[in-house]
C-alpha cells in the first residue's frame, strides 16, 4: 500500500491513509513513543487523582464545615484546598507540555516520512527521539496563544455587553454560545498551520501564520469533514477506554456526597491504589487510541498542499 504524503485526496482518502499508516507501522510508533507515553500516563493519573479524589474530598470537607457543622472554614483545610488547586493548575500545564513532547516523538517519524517517504525503525527500545520535541512544543504554545487571543477579546466584549444590558441574560447566553461556536469552527484551520510549521523547519511560526491560515480557511470544508469523521471514530474508542475512569470518578464523587450528608465514606482501603493504576493504564492506552488523529491531520496537510501546488501550476 502506497503512503505518499503529497497527493490530492478526498476526506475518505485522508482518513484511510492516516489509519493505514498507523496500523502498518504500529510497532515503529510504539517503539518511538512508549517512554514518553509512560510519562504522559503518570501525569494523566496524577491529574485525575487530584480532580476525582483530592479536590472533591476537600470540597466536601469545606461544605460540611460551612453548611452542616456551622463551624466555619478551618485555616488548615483552606490551605490544603488552595495547595491542591495550585498543584492542579501546575499539572495541567505539565500535562500540555508532556502531551506536546509525546506528539513530538511521533512527528519526528512523520517528518522523516515527509522528507524521504520512508521511516526507519529505532534500533533501541529505550530511546527517546528528541529532534522534533522542541519545535512541536513551540508549535503547541504558539497555536494555543494564537487561539486564546480572540477568545479573551471576545470574552471582554461580551462581558461589556452584559454590563450594558444586564436584564437580557437569556439573549446574552445565546449570543455567547453562537459566538464561541463560530470561533471554534474558525479555529479548525489552525491544525493545518500547526502541521505546516512543524514540517517546515527553518521557518518561524508567525511568518507562516497568515498565509497558512488563509490556505486552511479556503479548505475549511475539507478540514471540517475530515476531522468530524475521523474524530468521531477515535472519540468512540476513547470513550470506551475511559469508561473505567469515569466509573471510578463517579464512585469517588458519590462517596463524598454521602460523606457530606453524614454517611461514612464506604470506600475500600485499596481504592486509591486501584484508581491510580486505572488512570495510568487509561492514559497510556489513550495515547495510542488518539495517535491516528496525528496521521489524519498529517495527510490532510499533504492533501491541501498538493491541491494548492496543482492549482498554482494551472494558474501559470
Residue ranges of model-derived segments:
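Juxtamembrane transition segments at transmembrane-helix termini in multipass membrane proteins
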Residues: 2-6, 17, 54-79, 103-116, ...
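Interfacial aromatic "cap" segments that immediately flank transmembrane helices
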Residues: 3-42, 122-149, 188-238
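Generic N-terminal leader segments that precede the first folded domain
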Residues: 4-19, 24-27, 34-81, 85, ...
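Intrinsically disordered, low-complexity regions enriched in small/polar residues
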Residues: 13, 24-25, 165, 182, ...
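Hydrophobic alpha-helical transmembrane segments in multi-pass membrane proteins
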Residues: 32-55, 84-100, 138-162, 172-187, ...
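Transmembrane alpha-helical insertion/packing segments
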Residues: 61-92, 104-192
Amino acid at each position: 500500500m502506497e503512503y505518499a504524503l503529497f497527493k490530492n485526496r478526498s476526506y475518505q482518502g485522508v482518513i484511510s491513509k492516516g489509519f493505514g499508516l498507523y496500523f502498518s507501522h504500529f510497532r515503529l510508533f510504539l517503539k518511538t513513543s512508549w517512554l514518553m507515553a509512560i510519562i504522559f500516563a503518570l501525569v494523566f493519573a496524577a491529574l485525575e487523582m487530584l480532580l476525582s479524589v483530592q479536590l472533591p474530598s476537600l470540597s466536601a470537607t469545606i461544605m460540611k464545615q460551612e453548611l452542616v457543622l456551622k463551624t466555619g472554614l478551618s485555616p488548615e483545610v483552606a490551605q490544603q484546598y488552595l495547595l491542591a488547586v495550585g498543584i492542579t493548575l501546575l499539572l495541567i500545564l505539565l500535562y500540555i507540555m508532556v502531551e506536546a513532547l509525546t506528539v513530538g516523538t511521533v512527528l519526528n517519524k512523520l517528518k522523516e516520512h515527509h522528507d524521504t517517504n520512508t521511516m526507519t525503525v529505532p534500533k533501541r527500545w529505550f530511546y527517546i527521539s528528541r529532534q522534533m520535541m522542541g519545535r512541536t512544543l513551540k508549535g503547541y504554545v504558539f497555536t494555543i496563544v494564537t487561539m486564546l487571543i480572540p477568545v479573551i477579546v471576545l470574552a471582554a466584549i461580551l462581558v461589556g455587553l452584559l454590563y450594558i444590558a444586564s436584564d437580557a441574560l437569556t439573549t446574552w447566553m445565546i449570543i455567547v454560545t453562537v459566538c464561541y461556536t463560530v470561533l471554534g469552527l474558525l479555529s479548525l484551520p489552525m491544525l493545518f498551520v500547526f502541521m505546516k510549521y512543524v514540517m517546515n523547519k527553518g521557518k518561524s511560526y508567525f511568518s507562516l501564520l497568515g498565509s497558512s491560515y488563509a490556505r486552511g480557511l479556503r479548505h475549511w470544508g475539507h478540514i471540517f469533514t475530515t476531522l468530524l469523521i475521523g474524530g468521531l471514530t477515535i472519540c468512540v474508542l476513547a470513550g470506551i477506554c475511559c469508561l473505567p475512569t469515569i466509573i471510578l470518578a463517579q464512585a469517588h464523587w458519590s462517596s463524598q456526597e454521602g460523606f457530606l450528608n453524614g454517611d461514612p465514606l464506604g470506600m475500600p482501603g485499596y481504592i486509591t491504589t486501584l484508581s491510580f493504576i486505572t488512570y495510568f493504564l487509561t492514559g497510556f492506552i489513550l495515547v495510542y487510541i488518539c495517535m491516528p488523529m496525528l496521521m489524519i491531520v498529517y495527510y490532510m496537510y499533504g492533501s491541501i498542499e498538493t491541491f494548492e501546488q496543482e492549482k498554482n501550476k494551472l494558474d501559470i
